[in-house]
């Protein structure tokens, strides 16, 4: 039985993916159930918040046996390197010499261009496009339908809002939104 950390919508999607790809049954773990779990075994992250995903991955590393899952409907380039515990869903396309870190989620219909590097536990939501040569830091959240043009760097812990078009580097910890994407002002 595979343990899925999380019990929301994404966790339920991960359960379906595990059943399709691995043919195994799953147990969804709420935060309380996760805290009470002492024996881990095979585990998949069902968490969509990149910062939470990064913290849980770090906490369970060496205890849980994180599974790397690639949907058969994904088109993963033969020179793409995929880290431990990453999940690649249906419709994802990676081209040549892409490096995907540990615990990464590439959700439905994401495209990642040549020579891009995605840091640990980043979450790339449905329909996002990452052009060639992009560096995405650890714990980055890229919103649904966002576009990042070639050669840019998205710093650790940054957030790219849904539908945004990123045309400049994004510093660590900053949230950007809009077309072109600009830093959100703090309240």
Model-derived regions, located:
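Structural signal for interior beta-strand "rungs" in well-ordered beta-sheet cores
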Residues: 68-184
């Amino acid at each position: 039985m595979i343990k899925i950390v999380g019990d929301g919508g994404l966790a339920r999607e991960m359960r379906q993916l595990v059943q399709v790809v691995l043919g195994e049954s799953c147990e969804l773990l709420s935060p309380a159930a996760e805290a009470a779990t002492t024996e881990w075994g095979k585990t998949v992250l069902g968490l969509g918040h990149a910062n939470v995903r990064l913290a849980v991955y770090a906490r369970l590393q060496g205890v849980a046996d994180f599974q790397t899952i690639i949907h058969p409907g994904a088109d993963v380039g033969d020179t793409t390197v995929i880290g431990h515990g990453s999940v690649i869903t249906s419709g994802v396309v990676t081209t040549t010499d892409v490096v995907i870190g540990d615990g990464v989620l590439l959700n439905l219909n994401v495209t990642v261009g040549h020579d891009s590097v995605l840091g640990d536990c980043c979450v790339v939501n449905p329909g996002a496009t990452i052009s060639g040569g992009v560096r995405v830091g650890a714990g980055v959240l890229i919103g649904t339908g966002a576009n990042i043009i070639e050669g840019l760097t998205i710093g650790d812990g940054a957030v790219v809002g849904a539908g945004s078009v990123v045309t400049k580097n994004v510093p660590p910890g900053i949230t950007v939104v809009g077309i072109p994407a600009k830093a959100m002002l703090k309240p």
